[in-house]
């Protein structure tokens, strides 16, 4: 079931009761174990039913590095959600998924040597260039470097 896009703000959701009303679209049914709202990547039904957040968006694996990367991603997203005042859900369009996702991970705070393996695991299956949004030869600075290298030869 596709639901309409909406904006959530801190003023609108000052406590869990208000968030619960928004999550269930007015039909508060947190007592139902198999509520339809639990089948999303982020299951907030679990918050109202059990008091825990449940992420339902990762493939099963026993690889310790991948599991740690998934946990780090969930913690970073949760931290941003707590600190952020408002949010708008919208699809991001990108010609270079690898670059776009890497930039988002860095914005979440998953930067530096500490999260190198986390980024490696999360970016492993994406196509594109990590460092350059567009073809690196299209940037003026790279054109100058390439030209000077050719002149040296």
Where are these predicted regions, by residue range?
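Long, charge-rich alpha-helical interaction segments
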Residues: 8, 12-15
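Flexible helix-coil linker/hinge segments at domain or subdomain boundaries
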Residues: 79-96
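Long, highly charged low-complexity segments enriched in Glu/Asp and Lys/Arg with interspersed Ser/Thr
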Residues: 112-147
């Amino acid at each position: 079931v596709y639901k309409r896009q909406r904006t959530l703000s801190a003023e609108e959701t000052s406590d869990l009761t208000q968030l619960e009303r928004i999550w269930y679209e007015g039909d508060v049914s947190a007592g139902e174990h198999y509520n339809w709202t639990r089948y999303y990547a982020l299951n907030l039904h679990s918050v109202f039913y059990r008091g825990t957040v449940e992420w339902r968006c990762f493939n099963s694996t026993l690889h310790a590095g991948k599991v740690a990367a998934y946990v780090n991603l969930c913690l970073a997203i949760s931290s941003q959600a707590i600190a952020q005042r408002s949010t708008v859900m919208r699809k991001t369009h990108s010609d270079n998924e690898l670059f776009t996702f890497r930039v988002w991970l860095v914005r979440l705070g998953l930067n530096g040597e500490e999260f190198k393996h986390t980024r490696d695991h999360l970016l492993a299956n994406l196509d594109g260039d990590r460092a350059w949004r567009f073809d690196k030869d299209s940037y003026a600075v790279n054109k100058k470097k390439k030209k000077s290298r050719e002149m040296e030869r």
